[in-house]
Amino acid sequence: MAAPAAGPVFWRRLLGLLPGRPGLAALLGRLSDRLGRSRERRRRRSPWLLLAPLLSPTVPQVTSPPCCLCPEGVHRFQWIRNLVPEFGVSSSHVRVLSSPAEFFELLKGQIKMAKRRVVMASLYLGTGPLEQELVDCLESSLEKSLQSKFPSDLKVSILLDFTRGSRGRKNSRTMLLPLLQRFPEHVRVSLFHTPNLRGLLRLLIPERFNETIGLQHIKVYLFDNNVVLSGANLSDSYFTNRQDRYVFLQDCAEIADFFTELVDAVGDVSLQLQGDDTVDVVDGMVHPYKGDRAAYCRAANKRVMDVIHSARTRQQLLHAQTFHSDSLLSQEEAAAAGDRRPAPDTWIYPLIQMKPFEIQIDEIVTETLLTEAERGAKVFLTTGYFNLTQAYMDLVLGTRAEYQILLASPEVNGFFGAKGVAGAIPAAYVHIERQFYGEVCGLGQQDRVQLQEYWRTGWTFHAKGLWLYLAGSSLPCLTLIGSPNFGYRSVHRDLEAQIAIVTESRALQQQLHQEQEQLYLRSSVVTSATFEQPGRQVKLWVKMVTPLIKNFF
């Protein structure tokens, strides 16, 4: 009984951290009240959520001008640092990538230059020639590290999902075994296995579908002090013709340390791949599917939350040292010693969601951002798989901001043309899309909430995240980028991570705006005529099955 009880205690502690944030406090209260229940099972929409514009607090107006050291210009988002560490960086260290090819070349180049650490977290590693190129780059860098005149002791840590990474005779594990066998002291491969896939369920569900129960879905690629956050996996299509989003954080040591520790934490509660292709648990750790589930989840919660708390404490101390007057001398001394780093104009917040471990930070932050988006603000939200949670749908339909939601047309859905039952998944998404569009029209919200479908010949679409434009602004000041899809799986089943980037830099805002425009330019607006097209006719059995399976994809 200890595990369920831990949830409300966690929320009460968070409430104590949030004085003066009634909107966020209200959300935390709601999350606490519904702990242990599935809001997705409600048959009716909660009518009070449609009053969200009246219930949400007025966004405070910033009256003091921003200075070079204090993030007053983004004051309205500082509440996020009550939940997670806040990393202040210069926008010159942030670069937005635009294409799969650029992403692939960056990964290879960064691996080749790494001297100290390579940390990669992904759903899986593919088995084709492009993926082999990455493995070869890792092998070459490890070899060079050991043979150099001054060995750099390069360490490689890879975190993948167990079910997806073990599928088929040739898989992620077999791709990485040569590295593990040749460099056993320098390579670690961790395979996360959800605690929810166990017992009879694990025996009965076919290999192709067992990943529906829960996954390691985090996508972080880290090289020394450089970090790539993305929604892209390590597979050939993500390097060629599967559109995603990517941001490159250069020379950001504190952020790199945080994500290294996060991947280490998840790795410690995962199965460890051995040189003979067997797996084992870390000494002293509860087995994820053979051991006691509650004990495993408690241990995993503690391991991950310790990383978040310690990083948050470190950043608070750093913030205090930077901004207090008694630290001015040390700043001058640092500058004289050659530390010429520009003052931060951009703030990075890591948002973690691991509902199996009762960690719901990303959910809290996302709901609060949607709740507090004022009239006149614009939210551009994109997901490769349009299957919003009920809470997110309620907030989109019930708040004041304008929404443009970008989703995949059936032809660029990753499941389009798949064999068997999976081939019907694009039709299920069309059905969900049509239902949501019907609600938008039924509420007379067509002018405020707009759906757009991405289409590109020969490509698939996997981009996710959002861009927030404050009222009266033509450029975004905040973006969310990472692995979550805003759907039931992301919130309830999988391990997810993304970052909130808040910036005052016009140059970075221009980068983010251009990224958004490039994606939306390849889309068309959804109207009632969209669903009358021949390819949009959904079979009756798909309509009947969709409500039963929508929480699994």
Curated annotation (Swiss-Prot):
The GO terms this record gives for MF are: ATP binding; calcium ion binding; CDP-diacylglycerol-glycerol-3-phosphate 3-phosphatidyltransferase activity
One GO biological process from the UniProt record? phosphatidylglycerol biosynthetic process
Taxonomy, top ranks, is:
Eukaryota, Metazoa, Chordata, Craniata, Vertebrata
Q: What is this protein called?
A: CDP-diacylglycerol--glycerol-3-phosphate 3-phosphatidyltransferase, mitochondrial
Keyword line: ATP-binding, Lipid biosynthesis, Lipid metabolism, Mitochondrion, Nucleotide-binding, Phospholipid biosynthesis, Phospholipid metabolism, Phosphoprotein, Repeat, Transferase, Transit peptide
Q: Where in the cell is it found?
A: Mitochondrion
Domain named PLD phosphodiesterase is located at 212-238, 457-490
| Major location category of this protein | mitochondrion
Q: Cite the active-site annotation.
A: H217, K219, D224
Q: What is the organism field in this record?
A: Cricetulus griseus
Q: Which Gene3D superfamilies would you find in this protein's record?
A: Endonuclease Chain A
